[in-house]
Each structure stands twice: as C-alpha cells, then as structure tokens.
Amino acid sequence: MDLHNIREDYSKRELSEGDCADNPIEQFERWLDEAVRAQVNEPTAVNVAAVDGRGRPNSRMVLLKEVNSEGFVFFTNYHSRKGRSLDAHPFAAMTFFWPELERQVRVEGRVERLAEKLSDEYFESRPYQSRLGAWASAQSEVIPNKAVLVAKAAAVGLKHPLHVPRPPHWGGYIVIPDLIEFWQGRPSRLHDRIQYRLLDGGWIRERLSP
C-alpha cells in the first residue's frame, strides 16, 4: 500500500494569541465545548502515554471524565499496564485529536491517584454491567478464552445482584498539567501552535513553530 499521497490540507480555522484565554484550562474547556457542539465523534477520547518501570513507553485511549482547575481526570484499573506504569513513574502525556475541527491538544504533567471518595462517587454512576466488568476483568492479564471473562462477570452479578461496590484495584487518576499545547491545522503545514507552560505558579503563553 502506497501511503505517500494520503494527506489532508487543513484550512477550516486559525488560532491567534488574541483568541486564547489567559488560562489553558479555560481554553481547553472552550475547545471541548466546541467539539461537543460540532458533534465530533468521541470528543472526550484521549490518548494517555506513560513509561513503565523498564523505561518502555505505552499508550492507551481512555475517556476524560472531568476537567477542573486542578487537571484532567480519567478512571482505570490500577493493576493494568498503564496503572502500573503511572504508579512507577507518575507522569503522563495526553493527546486529544478532533479531526472534524482540525485540532489537537497535548497535555503533560504529574499524575496522582484520586481520593477514594471521588472514585467511589464516579463508580456509583456507572452502568450496572460496567461495574460488574470492573470486578471481572484482571486488565492486561492473559486469559485462556473469553468464556472465562463472561463467567467471572456472571459470578459477580450473582454475588452483587443490586449494588456493586467499587473494586479496590479500580479508580481515578488526575493529570496535573505543567504544559498544555493547542494545535490548529493550517494550509501548507503552517499550523498554529500555542503552548502554555507553568512557571513559578503562573502560565506563560507562547507560539511554537510548526
């Protein structure tokens, strides 16, 4: 397959310094709102990259579940490969991609586990079958076949027919950003890139060469 000529030329929008909020979280919320209103497919889907204890990188798509003044929140199995990586090296990079708007957002920062109370609250909001799955799946572990997973989920359902408590190995992380970059595709690959860096407790905004 020849991939050389598969490309898009971007021309829908531009991003100037005057368009940007002083705070990158506010700017992100603006862009996320625009992505939702534009009916972008999976606007909260984000790639999370981490490094394990051997220095090997790994990445996964997860769903952003909250953004606030502290950072970006997602939930996962703490025993999964990404969970073990984040516990070993508590730093992550996130990338949002909204092709319909020709936009990307990159986030880098320190990672912390959420307070158990907050993980409990979110877990209670999940559909019943999803809560069963959190108990049934030893995420990232090799299993002999799918039937084993289905049987485990059924067993959890028999044990917890009404209320499924949060497993201790499942919960949230928050990425506390020290760098956020907004990328807007432009013609001739002269893309707009506006970066915010945290310095001495305040955000510095600067333009990057594409």
UniProtKB/Swiss-Prot annotation:
Its cofactor is FMN. Keywords: Flavoprotein, FMN, Oxidoreductase, Pyridoxine biosynthesis. It is an enzyme of class 1 (oxidoreductase). Pfam families: PNP_phzG_C, PNPOx_N. FMN binds at residues 60-65, 75-76, 81-82, 104, 139-140, 183, 193. InterPro entries: Pyridox_Oxase, Pyridox_Oxase_CS, Pyridox_Oxase_N, Pyridoxamine_oxidase_dimer_C, Split_barrel_FMN-bd. Substrate binds at residues 7-10, 65, 122, 126, 130, 189-191. Pathway: Cofactor metabolism; pyridoxal 5'-phosphate salvage; pyridoxal 5'-phosphate from pyridoxamine 5'-phosphate: step 1/1; Cofactor metabolism; pyridoxal 5'-phosphate salvage; pyridoxal 5'-phosphate from pyridoxine 5'-phosphate: step 1/1. It comes from the Bacteria. It catalyses: pyridoxamine 5'-phosphate + O2 + H2O = pyridoxal 5'-phosphate + H2O2 + NH4(+); pyridoxine 5'-phosphate + O2 = pyridoxal 5'-phosphate + H2O2. Belongs to the pyridoxamine 5'-phosphate oxidase family. Homodimer. This is Pyridoxine/pyridoxamine 5'-phosphate oxidase. It comes from Neisseria meningitidis serogroup C / serotype 2a (strain ATCC 700532 / DSM 15464 / FAM18). The lineage of its organism: Bacteria, Pseudomonadati, Pseudomonadota, Betaproteobacteria, Neisseriales. The gene is pdxH.
